[in-house]
């Protein structure tokens, strides 16, 4: 029986660190896209340490109007594509524009109208995760 060679542990660790860095770059590009259009109360939720999480990160914000939501969503897509060359695998909510979801598989962006954000309460649902608020300078 031929022996198979295993990759050294160090290379595997570097690969997973690189992958994590890519997820964080994606999260940061989404945040930049939100900030570009003055999204309100931006938070990111680190879901990596939770069992059965649906992504590594959620990035959440809200806007003043449906037009503002659409503008933020377009900005996110533009920033992510320009910086990383990625497009969302799936998106929802463009028709009603009360909650637009952009799914990049490892990072999911949520752009809400304020009342819908309060109603669905994603921060409450994932309260056992690490939640970070992004300071606003506008």
Q: Where are these predicted regions, by residue range?
A:
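A short, glycine/Asx- and small/polar-enriched loop/turn
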Residues: 52-56, 103-106
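Long, contiguous binding/interaction regions
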Residues: 1-50, 64-71, 86, 92-94, ...
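Short amphipathic alpha-helices in soluble, non-transmembrane regions
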Residues: 72-77
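Short hydrophobic/aromatic beta-strand micro-patches
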Residues: 60-62
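A common structural junction motif
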Residues: 78-82, 130
């Amino acid at each position: 029986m031929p022996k198979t060679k295993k990759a050294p542990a160090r290379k595997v660790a570097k690969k997973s660190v690189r992958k994590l860095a890519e997820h964080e770059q994606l999260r940061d590009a989404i945040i930049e896209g939100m900030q570009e259009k003055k999204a309100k109360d931006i938070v990111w939720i680190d879901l990596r340490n939770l069992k059965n999480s649906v992504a590594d990160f959620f990035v959440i914000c809200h806007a003043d109007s449906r037009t503002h939501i659409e503008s933020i969503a377009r900005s996110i897509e533009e920033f992510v594509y320009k910086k990383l060359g990625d497009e969302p695998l799936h998106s929802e909510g463009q028709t009603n524009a009360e909650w637009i979801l952009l799914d990049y598989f490892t990072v999911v962006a949520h752009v809400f109208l304020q009342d819908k954000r309060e109603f669905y309460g994603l921060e409450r649902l994932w309260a056992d995760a690490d939640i970070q608020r992004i300071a606003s300078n506008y």
